[in-house]
């Protein structure tokens, strides 16, 4: 789909591809198809293999591709030749020219597999007039409060929220988060790969969002 001149494609599970001003970047690519192009930037949220997939980083990267990741991914990503890996943490901000990226908190309070002390990440990315919030593997957390203002501004504000209950926030919690953040558009993620989350979870998220006056849409995997 196109959002204010930014092309957004679903890579499956929790992965997305953004194309803007002739540049491509991917977030958490996992089991991507052969149709996905090489990218200039890859953002990794944390070290679990369905988010930090070495095979997919190798598949999408080219010489000089920048890979942002938290410290727990560092040793695994050293296996990928030719990339420029940058270890980042919450609060870091990187300006790529075509996109400005900020690292934000992502953790679960209901599941110890994503503990806050791990320092794992979500990302805010601004491209043109649009701010994209990629929540990562998270529950609703207090740190999301500072994002509530984005939905009240003139800028487009698009949020990507997990809908896989038991591991991260479930559908109802994701709808509650979307209501709090008041985005221009809410897009479900973390489903359909067989790891956790189903297409029905994503469909239910969209249905419940619309019942609550929230614009939401599923994307088709490329």
Language-model features, listed with the residues they occupy:
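Short, Asp-centered acidic motifs that coordinate Mg2+ and/or phosphate
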Residues: 24-25, 41, 158, 185
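Active-site metal-binding motif and surrounding structural segment of the metallo-beta-lactamase
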Residues: 30-76, 150-160
């Amino acid at each position: 789909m196109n959002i204010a001149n930014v092309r957004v494609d679903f890579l499956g599970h929790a992965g997305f591809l953004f194309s803007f001003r002739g540049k491509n970047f991917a977030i958490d690519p996992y089991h991507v198809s052969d149709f996905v192009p090489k990218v200039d930037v890859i953002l990794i949220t944390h070290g679990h293999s369905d988010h930090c997939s070495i095979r997919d980083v190798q598949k999408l990267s080219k010489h000089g591709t920048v890979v942002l990741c938290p410290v727990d991914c560092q040793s695994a990503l050293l296996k990928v030749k030719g990339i420029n890996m940058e270890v980042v943490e919450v609060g870091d901000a990187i300006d790529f020219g075509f996109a400005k990226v900020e690292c934000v908190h992502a953790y679960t309070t209901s599941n110890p597999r994503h503990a806050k002390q791990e320092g794992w990440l979500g990302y805010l990315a601004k491209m043109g007039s649009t701010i994209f919030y990629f929540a990562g593997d998270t529950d609703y957390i207090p740190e999301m409060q500072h994002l509530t203002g984005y939905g009240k501004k003139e800028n487009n504000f698009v949020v990507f929220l997990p809908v896989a209950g038991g591991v991260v926030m479930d559908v109802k919690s994701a709808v509650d988060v979307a209501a709090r953040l008041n985005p221009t558009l809410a897009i479900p993620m973390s489903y359909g790969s067989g790891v956790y989350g189903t297409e029905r979870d994503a469909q239910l998220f969209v249905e419940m969002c619309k019942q609550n006056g929230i614009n939401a849409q599923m994307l088709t995997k490329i």
